[in-house]
Amino acid sequence: LFEGDKQQKYAAYRRLKSSGTAHEWQQLISQQRYQDIDFNKIAGRALSILTNSKFLENHGLEDKFAQFILSQESAKYTGFVYELFAKPMHKKYQRLLVDKQFTGLINTAKQNMNRDSNFIVCVDTSGSMTCHACGTNISSYDVAKAMALYFSHLLEGKFANTFLEFNSYVKMHTWSDKTPTEKFFNFNSSYVGSTNFLGVAKLFAELKSKGYDESDFPTGVICISDGEF
């Protein structure tokens, strides 16, 4: 990219980053003005990268970031919902960021969604779902669970905060924890049995017999499976 040896290239790179070509926060980092960084001006993906590295810790920014993210109702994020849960979260502020970014995704969806349709996610929890999902760094089950959590926040009425699980049997679950990260990490399934998707229809028939009105039912089911039927 730059002429000269490695040291010269790095110096040229730093000059580029400290110029008007880079984002403001990148310029501040290059100038070592870490305390002047405005986290609100950093894109969601970049913020995730910074908080999942040792950058905040190494530059004494952990408390500042924790105060910032606590003060936010939501946070920006433009990635896929499952990507939010793909990294370990050893720090409280990492979980707080994911919670706020998840809320941001939900708020965006509610602003643009078709109110005449709502979907409940049905998660395959048969044994094969523990395998790595192609194109990601997490399992098929974790991708499905993240999608189930996302769509459950868009449901209303009797099915609000719920999702379906199927293997040899079908169950309906209600998330029991408060925050998105608590819900995601505290819920686990037993990876057993086969894939009995027909059981989903039987479950809705049972719910109707228990007094659920068809008008309360979701308008559709999103089945998330690795396809090993």
What are these regions (language model features)?
Residues 1-141, 153-229:
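Long lumenal/extracellular ectodomains of secretory and single-pass membrane proteins
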Residues 145:
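Catalytic core segments in nucleotide and nucleic-acid processing enzymes
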